Amino acid sequence: MVAEEDIEKQVLQLIDSFFLKTTLLICSTESSRYQSSTENIFLFDDTWFEDHSELVSELPEIISKWSHYDGRKELPPLVVETYLDLRQLNSSHLVRLKDHEGHLWNVCKGTKKQEIVMERWLIELDNSSPTFKSYSEDETDVNELSKQLVLLFRYLLTLIQLLPTTELYQLLIKSYNGPQNEGSSNPITSTGPLVSIRTCVLDGSKPILSKGRIGLSKPIINTYSNALNESNLPAHLDQKKITPVWTKFGLLRVSVSYRRDWKFEINNTNDELFSARHASVSHNSQGPQNQPEQEGQSDQDIGKRQPQFQQQQQPQQQQQQQQQQQRQHQVQTQQQRQIPDRRSLSLSPCTRANSFEPQSWQKKVYPISRPVQPFKVGSIGSQSASRNPSNSSFFNQPPVHRPSMSSNYGPQMNIEGTSVGSTSKYSSSFGNIRRHSSVKTTENAEKVSKAVKSPLQPQESQEDLMDFVKLLEEKPDLTIKKTSGNNPPNINISDSLIRYQNLKPSNDLLSEDLSVSLSMDPNHTYHRGRSDSHSPLPSISPSMHYGSLNSRMSQGANASHLIARGGGNSSTSAFNSRRNSLDKSSNKQGMSGLPPIFGGESTSYHHDNKIQKYNQLGVEEDDDDEDDRLLNQMGNSATKFKSSISPRSIDSISSSFIKSRIPIRQPYHYSQPTTAPFQAQAKFHKPANKLIDNGNRSNSNNNNHNGNDAVGVMHNDEDDQDDDLVFFMSDMNLSKEG
């Protein structure tokens, strides 16, 4: 029990030392802010920080409330205020404050206020906060607590040296020791110690009054009004907190709130230099507020001077008075018309930048051209432009007077904070003027003339627009004529549909076979020539396999070998093939064909005299005998040159196409070909240089038809490397020619 009582007494003594030393560091005239660094080492050394039996002879009697704490009573918060004492100033002195941009703000005259609060310290024993109640440690180590308090005092001493009040005191010392010029504009210049920095100790449990002084909560600079910083403090204040020290009786806390601006200046208004230097500045900054007083003073002065003159000179005096009043009135009107650059404005989040200007200033000419954003989705003016007064983009703000625009383009007007109408989605080459058809030219001319009369449009552009409208009216060829009741587009559409229906039966097989041919040989697709058409390319997706080709391939009796070797221009041959297939569509109801398979070339390609008869897609019924004979010859040549037939050549398929199904495995990186719902025309071509070589080879093969098999193999090997078919697919647009 004795040991616990001794520990408790030591803790209570540390709490008393905390309040006393903290107050001494802030209030004592021997604090670090008033002495040089060498003296500070002697006054606030390690011995002073570690000795907790310091006497309090220099502190006021009010500190006795916090000097004998027994652990049972409630200790009120201890408040220490640091202020600038103005009691020595007279009515001729003017106190001003300079902000961070160098602008001077009037604070008060010498006798209006006695104090300006600079700092407010809060020292307390917190035993009711959730932080203290949630602390789980019950026992207190006295040595550890003493070390923590020493660390707190050292941190407090460093913080005091960094606060703005210390810099203000250093300026005071320089002004006292330097040349004394009352009229100069140097900070805190006066003839003697008229101002000083003092402190006072207050009871935090009682209300703090600000009568006769400028309290800490009052902003001197008006731009700080209605604005808060990150810690929910007024913008002209800042706050620092020291980490609290835990004891069993509560948390020992120290915090400070202080002014951010500290560059005060004191000037004597009776000085001639000061009056000459600052008369124009104060007149412009206060202008409209001080004008009635100046007029009253001038009238009184004139009334006092009038008895000194004779009665005969009174008319002349009245004329001079009138002239002087007129001059003053002109000066006032000129000052009111000028933009108040030096006027102190109270900016808040809800303040409009144009609300400080008279209505005559709001009628400004803004350029009507705005940056075009064709790919931006959403409204342009969805946010109010007044949130940021420094924002230079005032295009979102509507003009004040626009009667002509509101009459014709009502939805385009936007109130502040709302979005612009739908017309902002598309940009017009005439600004806000909409385009109309020239059927009613008189009405459109009137609308354009009304819209052009907007104050936002320059005079030159108005004349240009009127000349352009007159030019449109003078040329009737430019008028847009509405379609008559005959509906010729419908006739063209019906003709196209009829042609499409006629082409459908003849191209059903071809469209399916083309899609199959695209998936047969992936190795040769890279070497195909580019098509002249604009049709979409087939999609490529993961692997899908065909079980068999279309059942129409089993119709071998009616099948014809569709091998086209066109010469010359590929587009011309493709167009002719479409014409032939269109003309002969009525006679080709029973036509069918084989899909052209990309692969190794067989010897049947060298019979040029036989194949030239089939250079068109449409084959008439008169050539059935020729087809059979050609197929028989191809079959014979295939059996003769069996070693030269490629597994995926046309001859290999033609020899076995009578089967109902031909299993062909689909490569893994090709998707199932999509058969389009529309019909496509296609033709197979080879390059012109290949046609000449193949013609020569076909002649040599006809002369040496019974030659050696090895020669045939050599020809087939060369053609396998060079004789890739080039696929041209025409566009899906139907030809208008019959």
Curated annotation (Swiss-Prot):
Keyword terms, alphabetized: Autophagy, Cytoplasm, Phosphoprotein, Protein transport, Transport
Location of the protein in the cell: Cytoplasm; Preautophagosomal structure
One of the GO biological process terms: piecemeal microautophagy of the nucleus
Quaternary state and interactors: Hypophosphorylated form interacts with ATG1 to form the ATG1-ATG13 kinase complex. The ATG1-ATG13 complex interacts with the ATG17-ATG29-ATG31 complex through direct interaction with ATG17. Interacts with VAC8.
Pfam families, per the entry: ATG13 (PF10033)
Compositional bias annotation for Polar residues: 345-359, 534-558, 570-579
Database matches in InterPro entries: ATG13, Atg13_N, HORMA_dom_sf
Provenance organism: Saccharomyces cerevisiae (strain YJM789) (Baker's yeast)
Name recorded for this polypeptide: Autophagy-related protein 13
Record PTM text: Phosphorylated; hyperphosphorylated by the TORC1 kinase complex to repress the induction of autophagy. Starvation and TOR inactivation results in ATG13 partial dephosphorylation leading to ATG1-binding. Rephosphorylated by ATG1 during prolonged nitrogen starvation. Also phosphorylated by TPK1; TPK1 phosphorylation regulates the association of ATG13 with the PAS. Within this regulatory network, mitochondrial respiratory deficiency suppresses autophagic flux. Hyperphosphorylation in rich medium is impaired in the absence of VAC8.
Start and end residues of each stretch annotated as Interaction with ATG1: 432-520
Region: Disordered, residue numbers: 279-359, 377-462, 521-605, 690-719
Stated role: Activates the ATG1 kinase in a nutritional condition dependent manner through the TOR pathway, leading to autophagy. Required for autophosphorylation of ATG1 at 'Thr-226' and its dimerization. May also be involved in the regulation of autophagy through SNF1. Involved in ATG9 and ATG23 cycling through the pre-autophagosomal structure. Also involved in cytoplasm to vacuole transport (Cvt) and more specifically in Cvt vesicle formation. Seems to play a role in the switching machinery regulating the conversion between the Cvt pathway and autophagy.
